[in-house]
Curated annotation (Swiss-Prot):
EC class of the enzyme, as a word: hydrolase
Major place of residence: cytoplasm
Protein name stated in the entry: Endoribonuclease YbeY
Protein family (similarity comment): Belongs to the endoribonuclease YbeY family.
PROSITE patterns per the UniProt record, alphabetical: UPF0054
Lineage: Bacteria, Pseudomonadati, Pseudomonadota, Gammaproteobacteria, Pasteurellales
Cofactor notes: Binds 1 zinc ion.
Transmembrane stretches, start-end: none
Gene of this entry: ybeY
Example GO molecular function: zinc ion binding
One Gene Ontology CC term in the entry: cytoplasm
Role summary: Single strand-specific metallo-endoribonuclease involved in late-stage 70S ribosome quality control and in maturation of the 3' terminus of the 16S rRNA.
EC number: 3.1.-.-
Cofactor (UniProt): Zn(2+)
Database matches in Gene3D superfamilies: Metalloproteases ('zincins'), catalytic domain
Length: 158
């Protein structure tokens, strides 16, 4: 399964961003992991890399939170009776990713991968609102990250 990704760079500084292939690999791993328990067809999604101003605006508009955030997920809502391979949109804020990676003392690639996987799982219907959901989602993220050769992103919390 190779997802079709519309990668949009809306950040003033695009240096140091992961490649389209890296994003595709990370999404593919999340989808492949999920496909073991469900039937996911060929999937299309948009990944938009933004600056803090756009992240802040979207976070305020859609979540009522007056600050920028690292990743926003907007699942595509398919009308009943229509089958489309559209999964949704991920909005990832470049500056927040860089700040968090520095604060957490992790590689940029690891943090980009984690947030891409985290957002993709949200598009697949996972959430972390309650403790049980959070444990399930974080467990999946940890497994996928380790399959990709990265450290468990929640290791410090365990």
């Amino acid at each position: 399964m190779n997802p079709i990704i519309d990668l949009q760079i809306a950040s003033e500084n695009s240096q140091g961003l992961p490649s389209a292939q890296q994003f595709s690999d990370w999404v593919k791993h999340a989808l492949t992991y999920e496909a073991q328990t469900s039937n996911i067809p060929l999937t299309e999604l948009t990944i938009r890399i933004v600056d803090e101003a756009e992240s802040h605006h979207l976070n305020l508009t859609y979540r009522g939170k007056d600050k920028p955030t690292n990743v926003l997920s907007f699942p595509f809502e398919v009308p009943e009776g229509i089958e489309l391979p559209l999964l949704g949109d991920l909005i990832i804020c470049r500056q927040i990713v860089e700040k968090e990676a520095l604060e957490q003392k992790i590689s940029l690639d690891a943090h980009w991968a984690h947030l891409t996987i985290h957002g993709t799982l949200h598009l697949l219907g996972y959430d972390h609102i309650d403790e049980h959901e959070a444990e399930q989602m974080e467990g999946l993220e940890s497994d996928i990250m380790q399959q990709l050769g990265f450290q468990d992103p929640y290791l410090a919390e365990k």
